[in-house]
């Protein structure tokens, strides 16, 4: 059976109408409401919980593959999510992640190097100052994708002392 052109246009208008309605509603995806049961999921959930309870200025995800930042993003915290990655392609992907601000970082070999890279980037911004509390979620040792296993409460500027 062939469809007339009118049917195609009606379907296109209905689709555009749904898109507009969703955009006007804020285009919000509901947050993840259940407690995850995987190691990386629980670590991400805990980092968000700790950051909110401590009134941290931000949650920082140091990520190789982007997965850590995406896991935190889907929890929809009211805190800024700052995603650091040494991979330009991952940074481009994360630019499309809900609520994430992305940073290209150097490759780091240790947690101390990671904290120093975070301090250097954030203290250059007007939004953050020395002594601000952030919560960092990452994998240790750094650089291994899928190894999210660390949460650290960090005061900006601590690496300079």
Label each PLM-derived region with a short phrase.
Residues 46-74:
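C-terminal accessory/binding modules appended to enzymatic or scaffolding proteins
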Residues 42-56, 115-126, 132:
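Phosphate-interacting basic helix/loop segments used at nucleotide- and nucleic-acid interfaces
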Residues 129-142, 148-154:
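C-terminal binding/interaction regions
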Residues 1-9:
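Single conserved hydrophobic/aromatic residue that forms the stacking wall/gate
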Residues 14-48:
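Long, charged amphipathic helices and adjacent flexible linkers at domain junctions
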């Amino acid at each position: 059976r062939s469809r007339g052109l009118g049917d195609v246009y009606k379907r296109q208008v209905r689709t555009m109408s749904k898109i507009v309605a969703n955009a006007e509603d804020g285009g919000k995806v509901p947050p993840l409401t259940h407690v995850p049961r995987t190691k990386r999921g629980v670590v991400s959930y805990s980092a968000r919980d700790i950051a909110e309870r401590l009134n941290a200025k931000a949650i920082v995800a140091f990520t190789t593959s982007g997965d850590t930042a995406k896991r935190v993003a889907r929890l929809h915290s009211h805190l800024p999510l700052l995603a650091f990655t040494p991979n330009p392609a991952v940074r481009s992907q994360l630019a499309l992640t809900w609520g994430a601000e992305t940073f290209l970082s150097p490759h780091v070999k240790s947690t101390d190097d990671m904290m120093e890279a975070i301090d250097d980037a954030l203290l250059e911004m007007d939004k953050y100052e020395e002594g601000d509390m952030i919560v960092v979620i990452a994998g240790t040792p750094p650089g291994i994708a899928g190894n999210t296993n660390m949460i650290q409460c960090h005061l900006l500027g601590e690496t300079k002392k």
